[in-house]
Amino acid sequence: MKDQKGDVNIVELQGTVGSAPAIDRKKGFEEIIKADPKFKITRSQTGDFTRAKGKEVMEAFLKAEGKKINVLYAHNDDMAIGAIQAIEEAGMKPAKDITIISIDGVKGAFEAMIAGKLNVSVECSPLLGPQLMSAVKDIKAGKTLPKRIVTEEGIFPMEVAAKEFPNRKY
């Protein structure tokens, strides 16, 4: 996308309005793309973190923008998977005609990447719970915790999805 001549038209499927993940994911994305004026969010609407709403909103985006859409940024994988259905039903090829970026790194996203329908999923690991419980046990045992506990997460482009898929815990 960086080497593309002209504007890069982005449509955004936001999470549930007012939720911390939706706010943070929008803010973080906008901070990154503002560094290059050719990246333009042409449409942005809530998909409520659901597959059905993601499909419905993407259908509306496609009716309004059609082939002008270069990138779909979805705040979660479920909305992206719904949007993929809408893109296919519109006769387009997801991950080819429209670059698709989503967040969570769930099993369905890996399946979509392996099928060549999703370009990249940015992991948001649900495995924070076990780390939290371990920290609670350590506190109860009188141990000192590190100042910061980091949950390992990754960025998974479609090219590595098949290799990484067997290692997924969720």
Language-model features, listed with the residues they occupy:
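Extracytoplasmic substrate-binding proteins
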Residues: 1-27, 32, 36
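Hydrophobic alpha-helical segments within soluble ligand-binding/sensing domains
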Residues: 1-8, 24, 53-55, 105-109, ...
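Structured segments of extracytoplasmic/periplasmic soluble domains
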Residues: 3, 32-36, 60-64, 86-90, ...
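Loop/turn elements at helix/coil->beta-strand transitions in domains of secreted/extracellular proteins
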Residues: 5-9, 36-41, 67-70, 95-99, ...
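Short beta-strand elements in bilobed, periplasmic/extracellular small-molecule ligand-binding domains
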Residues: 9-12, 33-51, 152
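Short beta-strand elements at the ligand-binding edges of bilobed clamshell
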Residues: 12-13, 44, 115-126
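Hinge/cleft segment of the Venus flytrap/periplasmic-binding protein
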Residues: 13-21, 32-33, 124-170
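Hydrophobic alpha-helical
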Residues: 29, 42-43, 47-111
